[in-house]
Amino acid sequence: MANGAGNGGGGAGGNGGGGNNGAGNRAEELQPHPVKEQLPGIQYCVNSPPPWLEAVVLGFQHYLLSLGITVLIPSLLVPLMGGGDAEKVKVIQTLLFVSGLTTLFQSFFGTRLPVIASASYAYIIPITSIIYSTRFTYYTDPFERFVRTMRSIQGALIITGCFQVLVCFLGVWRNIVRFLSPLSIAPLVTFTGLGLYHIGFPLVKKGPMIWDGNRCDRYGMMLCIPVVWLFAQLLTSSGVYDHKPQTTQTSCRTDRTGLITNTPCPTFDITDSFAMMAASFVTLFESTGLFYASARYGKNVGLLAMTKVGSRRVIQISAAFMLFFSIFGKFGAFFASIPLPIMASLYCIVLCFVSSAGLSFLQFCNLNSFNTKFILGFSFFMAISIPQYFREYYNGVGRCDKSDIHVTYNGCGNNCDSA
């Protein structure tokens, strides 16, 4: 009896042990990632600057990145105004100086976030409307037309700047931002990056098609820009682009703009001012989205997210580079000769971080709610659909008058033919 009891106990013990092993092998239920105020992996925060030599290199990277938009906007607008290469150089120097000064003020006295204040694409539409105004068509001299147009743009920007100052100092924008929830911030920040998709790969494909680690992430721009720039210089010097179309030469040649060889009282109109003030609301939302993204990450959008360095010292050094190269135009013109496809390839990387910063706000939302899903889906869909409507409208395939136009479907889209 004793032996039987002992065997039974052993069997029971063995069975019990088997049951415990089965419970240990049971798959654990998946748990959501915990919400963190700051993402891990940041090596230098706002108040922990890197060494001076490293900060100078990182600041120069930010200068190169901001140089892309600083050169692209004058390259689009100055020829429409009647200006040449010399006028384009002056506009680029002015944009660099103002961007550097604004960045310094913002880093010392403003929000003090590691953010570079640069030009915005939102003002291109109202500026273009001023350029094509009928009151400037009577000037036959291109230089005089450029001067008159620039004075009107300056006057509109002065009124718009005063308007933005009043909106911010009176607390109007502070009260508006107070109602922004994580659900409303997510599409705002996301499309701050996605809204600039047209300056990414569409510009990269105009150029020639040609070690993983922490240092490659941090100094990626310093490694890739000189190599690709030298390659573009070799192609330009060897005459590869001499017989290419003009659009290819404009995008790829290092001497395309003549910047290096050409490096020396506003008017006010109520119509221009109102158009510019409408664009200022867009920039207010754009700046708010970037500041939210920067504060959420604990590092700046774009390049700061890639380098994992969110120090104010880096941004202030970058602003110093802007001021220096805007005063000494020959140096600035040298770096401004970087081909646009090189800068566009950088935008393909850094704008991804801007968009992902907006999506990170969704972790604070209840995605199981149908109201949340509808608001999120509606915001994303309309942010894509409305610009597409205006794009088709200005291309002549949008709204049609049925009394005068017969609409036919050709299998690829709407085609409007005269009846």
Swiss-Prot record:
Membrane topology according to the record: Multi-pass membrane protein
Compositional bias annotation for Gly residues: 1-22
GO cellular component, one term: membrane
Superkingdom of the source species: Eukaryota
InterPro entries named among the record's database cross-references: NCS2
Keywords: Membrane, Transmembrane, Transmembrane helix, Transport
Main subcellular location of this protein, as a coarse class: membrane
Region annotation Disordered: where it falls in the sequence: 1-28
Keyword Transport belongs to the record: yes
Record localization: Membrane
Sequence similarity: Belongs to the nucleobase:cation symporter-2 (NCS2) (TC 2.A.40) family.
PANTHER family in alphabetical order: XANTHINE-URACIL / VITAMIN C PERMEASE FAMILY MEMBER
Protein name, as recorded: Putative nucleobase-ascorbate transporter 9
Organism the protein comes from: Arabidopsis thaliana (Mouse-ear cress)
Source species taxonomy: Eukaryota, Viridiplantae, Streptophyta, Embryophyta, Tracheophyta
Recorded name of the encoding gene: NAT9
